[in-house]
Amino acid sequence: MKAGIHPNFKKATVKCACGNEFETGSVKEEVRVEICSECHPFYTGRQKFASADGRVDRFNKKYGLK
């Protein structure tokens, strides 16, 4: 690797909109995110399942399939 062309890698504080903070490595000192693993529905188990009432479901209902 060439010397002097790589950015300085330092500890960064990641701040989420929910108030959660944690440290990681980055070229920036502070990173702000809208969603993290503490508030994301997939990780918290509060995931909403959208019912897919699309064309296939309407077809199956109309013709008595399924």
Curated annotation (Swiss-Prot):
UniProt-annotated binding residues for Zn(2+): C16, C18, C36, C39
Triggers of expression: Only accumulates during exponential growth.
Top-level division of the source organism's lineage: Bacteria
Named cofactor requirement(s): Zn(2+)
Classification via InterPro entries: Ribosomal_bL28/bL31-like_sf (IPR034704), Ribosomal_bL31 (IPR002150), Ribosomal_bL31_A (IPR027491), Ribosomal_bL31_sf (IPR042105)
PROSITE patterns assigned: RIBOSOMAL_L31
GO molecular function ontology, one term from the record: metal ion binding
GO biological process: translation
Annotated Gene Ontology cellular component terms: ribonucleoprotein complex; ribosome
Cofactor, free-text remark: Binds 1 zinc ion per subunit. This zinc stabilizes the protein.
NCBIfam families referenced in this protein's UniProt entry, alphabetically: L31, PRK00019.1, PRK00528.1
The protein's assembly and partners: Part of the 50S ribosomal subunit during exponential growth.
Similarity comment: family membership: Belongs to the bacterial ribosomal protein bL31 family. Type A subfamily.
PANTHER family: 50S RIBOSOMAL PROTEIN L31, CHLOROPLASTIC (PTHR33280), LARGE RIBOSOMAL SUBUNIT PROTEIN BL31C (PTHR33280:SF1)
The protein's role, per its UniProt record: Binds the 23S rRNA. While neither of the L31 paralogs is essential, this protein seems to function as the main L31 protein. Has a lower affinity for 70S ribosomes than the non-zinc-containing paralog L31B (ytiA); is displaced by it to varying extents, even under zinc-replete conditions.
Name by which UniProt lists this protein: Large ribosomal subunit protein bL31
